[in-house]
Amino acid sequence: MEASARLYTLNYNEVKTYMWAAIFVVCNLVLPQVFHLIPQGGIIFAPLSLVILAGAYKFGWRVGLIAALASPLVNHLLTGMPAWNVLPVMTFKLAMLALTAGFTAQHFKKVTLLLLIGVVLVAELTGGLGELALTGGIEATVQDFTIGWPGLLLQIIGAYLVCKYL
C-alpha cells in the first residue's frame, strides 16, 4: 500500500519544530495512561514508540528526536514511569526510532507499509544493540518481539494512517 502524503522535514530554527515536538510529548503523557489501563498494556503496545514513529516520519527526524529525548524524561518526572533504571535504554531506543523514521521519510519522500515495517525492524535492531551496549543484555528487545508484537503492528498501522491522513 502506497499513499500520497505530505511529509515534512522541519529544522531546529523553525518554531513549528518545537510546537510539534511539544504536542508529541503531551501525546506521550496521555497515551501511556490509556494503555496502562490494559494489563501489561505498556509492555505490549509501547505507546511512546507509536507517537515517535508517526511524528518523526511525518515531521522529520529533528521533531522526532526532540520528542524521543524529552518524552521518557517528562513522563518519568510527572508519573514515575518509565522506571529510572530503564530510562537510558528507552530513550536510546526512541531516539533510534526517530532517526530511522525521519531519515527514511526524508530519503523516500513517501509513506508505505513496507517502509514503516523496515523502519521498525531497523530501529528495533539498533535499539537492541544499544541496549546490549548499555546493559549487557537484550532481554527487553526480545520481549518487544515476543510480548510486544501487537504493539509493533499498531505502530506500523497507526503511523501509516497518521502520515497518510493527517
Name every feature range the model reports, one short phrase each.
Residues 2-55, 62-63:
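Hydrophobic transmembrane alpha-helices
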Residues 8-13, 103-112:
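Membrane-interface helix-boundary motifs at transmembrane edges
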Residues 17, 61-65, 107-113:
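Membrane-helix interface segments
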Residues 25-34, 70-80, 120-129:
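Aromatic-anchored segments of alpha-helical transmembrane domains
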Residues 37-42, 81-91, 96, 106-166:
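Membrane-embedded alpha-helical hairpins and interfacial helices in multi-pass inner-membrane proteins
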Residues 55-56, 105:
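Helix-capping/transition residues at the boundaries of transmembrane alpha-helices
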Residues 65-70, 158:
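Short hydrophobic alpha-helical segments that form membrane-spanning helices or hydrophobic packing faces
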